[in-house]
Amino acid sequence: MKELLEKFENKRPEIVFEWKDTETPAEGWVVINSLRGGAAGGGTRMRMGLDKREVESLAKTMEVKFTVSGPPIGGAKSGINFDPNDPRKAEVLHRWYAAVMPLLKYYYGTGGDLNVDEIHEVIPITEDVGIWHPQEGVFTGHYKPSEPQKVNRIGQLRQGVVKVIEDPRFTPSLEKKYTIADMCTGYGVAQAVGHYYGLWHNGAKGKRVVLQGWGNVGAAAGFYLSQMGMKVVGIISKEGGLINQAGFGQEEINRLVLDRQGNKLVSPDLLPFEIANEKIWDLEFEVFIPAAASATFLL
């Protein structure tokens, strides 16, 4: 098994698309590990210091994910080396998606990822450059639909991911109008953990959790895991951390989700990162959720 994994990790990706912006220092890569099933999928991320190797690694991770959970397509990822707080971010994304438009049209599907918002950035910008939906390429390359089928299915996609959650069981606040895209990845993480403990360890209730990262994935996962009766005992992000060996209550978790500023963990009780990073690994916990940027923290 180890030899197979090493062979998989060391195999060159099928397609690597490299881009250099003409107006800023931004540079980016689309890495498509394979076009298994006629298409590949993986989100778009942006951060300073990102390099091609990180994107390659994430594309391979996406391929493992699709192999396990479907659909049977290849793994891919897009990454842009640029400061997401730069006021030129929207312009950079527009030029990026204009450049990769042919891939997105026929065999590559993308979405939001680290520092790139699916609802407010990916969907409107890709639409502006001529893509019906960020997943159009997967639908075209993998399912090979007729034109009427394509119009119908992509219409359903367009409506589905931006749908506001109306059931109070699935959102920390109806007033905040969280969408499916905001919460679905964290929900999937929580469901995977819940099913694992349901199958092998007499249920998830009471199990203790540490979360690394408090963006869309980490915060949503924390919300749903807490709903299952699991105890979030620690949260660490680049801003700092929160520790409570007894576990944060559901109302406390809800408030931490609602008080986020983008991907930032916000709390009057926030410990400095150095202190939190020293103490959090001494907590007693059964579950660790790595939901931060790649290689952000060292254990």
Predicted ranges, named:
Residues 49-58:
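Active-site cofactor/substrate anionic-group-binding motifs, chiefly glycine-
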Residues 67-204:
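Glycine/serine-rich phosphate-binding loop and adjoining beta1-alpha1 elements at the start
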Residues 275-287, 293-299:
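Rossmann-fold NAD(P) dinucleotide-binding segment
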Residues 22-24, 35-37, 51, 216-217, ...:
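Short, glycine-/Ser/Thr-/acidic-enriched flexible segments
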